[in-house]
Amino acid sequence: MSVHIGAKTGEIAERILLPGDPLRAKYIAETFLEGAVCYNEVRGMLGFTGTYKGERISVQGTGMGVPSISIYVNELIQSYGVKTLIRVGTCGAIQPDVRVRDVILAMSASTDSNMNRLIFRGRDYAPTADFHLLRTAYEVGVEKGLALKVGNVFTADMFYNDEPNWETWARYGVLAVEMETAALYTLAAKFGCRALSVLTVSDHILTGEETTAEERQMTFNEMIEVALEAAIRNGA
């Protein structure tokens, strides 16, 4: 056991999907995994291990934001030996050519979080996805005929921000806003692991367009399939 995860040694697979919502973790386990067993209920942050196409896979809720995902990624890697981590979640688009229901593969992540400034003593660090996971996820998405975008996302430290300045980030090519990827990529790099964020565009920040619950669920399923295929095709 670790501080925030109640699993025993060996109960978590080396490949894991990371939704923010623990109920999404339960949904993924029940919908996509065979023989799924719950290994964690600490703080209501559900975690499950099962198989997908015969390959062992885990799924763990992380909560929202850099501090929360950092806790789970640190413990999954250091206490349980996880090697491949794929975030699956939603984001808000800030580019006119990115539409709701599109799937974004986050090649890199800008951020206003001070996490990396603290780690690197005031200097900037460029959190980046694992190339092999990114390439495989892109190939799977193309095979499925999905509306894919690949590029930089912005990891925000605040959900409610009175002065977000999205126009500047958009001018520099950032595709969308979310709250976890920069931390995931930084920690994966620190420990020599592989990481990727696969994100569904749930709303458009500039236009105000939003998806319905049904639309989000349909696109979410496609996103999960991309993430699962990327995980098993790249081994541990």
From Swiss-Prot:
Assigned EC number: 2.4.2.1
Residues at the active site: D203
SUPFAM superfamilies: Purine and uridine phosphorylases
Amino acids binding phosphate: G20, R24, R43, R87, V88, G89, T90
PROSITE patterns: PNP_UDP_1
Molecular function terms from GO: purine-nucleoside phosphorylase activity
Catalysis performed (reactions): a purine D-ribonucleoside + phosphate = a purine nucleobase + alpha-D-ribose 1-phosphate; a purine 2'-deoxy-D-ribonucleoside + phosphate = a purine nucleobase + 2-deoxy-alpha-D-ribose 1-phosphate
Record: residues binding a purine D-ribonucleoside: H4, E178, M179, E180, S202, D203
PANTHER family: FI09636P-RELATED, URIDINE PHOSPHORYLASE
Alphabetical list of NCBIfam families matching this protein: deoD (TIGR00107), PRK05819.1 (NF004489), PRK13374.1 (NF009914)
Role played: Catalyzes the reversible phosphorolytic breakdown of the N-glycosidic bond in the beta-(deoxy)ribonucleoside molecules, with the formation of the corresponding free purine bases and pentose-1-phosphate.
HAMAP family: Pur_nucleosid_phosp
Protein name listed in UniProt: Purine nucleoside phosphorylase DeoD-type
Organism per entry: Geobacillus kaustophilus (strain HTA426)
